[in-house]
């Protein structure tokens, strides 16, 4: 009989319906309810992208496809997928409890975020391992980062090339690629967090692979807190690049995310487009990885490499 291995797929989570928005943001704010104005603003953002984010559906599809693919490409072990979310059910701890109840003793934990940071990957894996230790007889093997995975870089190289191939030579000369990820509080840099360096590296790999000469790194979706967040913000960067270099076509690659959701559909497709419209420039944004076969193949390699190194 094949050994069963847990596949703990972790992600941020998103409201399933409009009524979930308040409790979801209360959880993000560690139990403090958002003010009525804040709640209205958030609800309006969701309405602007069609009422609710497609993220919940995409995350589940990514996780199910990954489980299926892992069990197709090898015959040594049987992977059982459990979904654990940071801010809404099924919570990370619930997924770990389910694994324990199913008699799983080893699990590979994959966070659907390519770059490591203490705020994201470390906190997800930490929560899972803490719960597993409480329950006993279950070891969680966490994957730190996978931004260097060749198939991940290739996904974005192909996506970016697809946009540039549709441009004339003249447009290409005046085009710039903005590679971005979710901003985090600046204090992580002083703590030696590798997150900003990993994004810079990712941008270099993609620009080199796609043969894009003009590119810059930006940050987006910063939180509304008194602490300074990592910049430059993608909107400010857009204006600055237009003013300084006269770029008139902007290609946004939000590589810190793996799916279409509020941060991409609103912060990029709406907010950044407002800026490009303002300055009379063109807006482009390649398709996100979502549950595409190319991306599922990438994640499959990531999990298999981890399994080989620990089990």
Curated annotation (Swiss-Prot):
Which BP terms from GO are recorded? Answer: heme biosynthetic process
InterPro entries, per database record = Ferrochelatase, Ferrochelatase_AS, Ferrochelatase_C, Ferrochelatase_N
Presence of keyword Repeat: no
Which positions in this protein are listed as binding Fe(2+)? 182, 263
Which keywords annotate this record? Cytoplasm, Heme biosynthesis, Iron, Lyase, Metal-binding, Porphyrin biosynthesis
What Gene3D superfamilies does its record include? 3.40.50.1400
Name the Enzyme Commission number(s) assigned to this protein.
4.99.1.9
Name of the coding gene:
cpfC1
Disulphide linkage map: none
Organism, scientific name: Bacillus cereus (strain ATCC 14579 / DSM 31 / CCUG 7414 / JCM 2152 / NBRC 15305 / NCIMB 9373 / NCTC 2599 / NRRL B-3711)
The entry's protein name is Coproporphyrin III ferrochelatase 1
Quickly give the catalysed reaction: Fe-coproporphyrin III + 2 H(+) = coproporphyrin III + Fe(2+)
The family database entries (PROSITE patterns) matched by this protein are listed as: FERROCHELATASE (PS00534)
Q: Which GO terms describe its molecular function?
A: ferrochelatase activity; metal ion binding
């Amino acid at each position: 009989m094949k050994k069963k291995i847990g596949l703990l797929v972790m992600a941020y989570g998103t409201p399933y319906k409009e009524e979930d928005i308040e409790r979801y943001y209360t959880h993000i704010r560690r139990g403090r309810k958002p003010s009525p104005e804040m709640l209205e603003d958030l609800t309006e953002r969701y309405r602007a992208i069609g009422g609710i984010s497609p993220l919940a559906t995409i995350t589940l599809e990514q996780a199910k496809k990954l489980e299926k693919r892992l069990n197709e490409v090898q015959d040594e072990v049987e992977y059982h997928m459990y979904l654990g979310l940071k801010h809404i059910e099924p919570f990370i701890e619930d997924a770990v409890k389910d694994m324990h109840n199913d008699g799983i003793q080893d699990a590979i934990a994959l966070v659907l975020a390519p770059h490591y940071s203490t705020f994201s990957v470390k906190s997800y894996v930490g929560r899972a391992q803490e719960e597993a230790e409480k329950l006993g007889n279950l070891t969680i093997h966490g994957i730190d980062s996978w931004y260097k995975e060749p198939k991940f870089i290739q996904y974005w190289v192909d996506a970016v090339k697809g946009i540039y191939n549709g441009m004339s030579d003249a447009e290409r000369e005046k085009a710039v690629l903005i590679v971005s990820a979710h901003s985090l509080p600046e204090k992580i840099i002083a703590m030696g967090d590798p997150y900003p360096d990993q994004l810079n590296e990712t941008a270099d790999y993609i620009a080199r692979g796609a043969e894009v000469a003009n590119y810059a790194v930006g940050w987006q979706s910063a939180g509304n807190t008194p602490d300074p967040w990592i910049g430059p913000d993608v909107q400010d960067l857009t204006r600055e690049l237009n003013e300084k270099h006269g770029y008139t076509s902007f290609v946004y690659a939000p590589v810190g995310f793996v799916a279409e959701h509020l941060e991409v559909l609103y912060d990029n497709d709406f907010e950044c487009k407002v800026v490009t419209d303002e300055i009379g420039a063109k807006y482009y944004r390649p398709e996100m990885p979502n549950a595409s076969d190319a991306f599922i193949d990438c994640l499959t390699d990531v999990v298999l490499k981890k399994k080989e190194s620990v089990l």
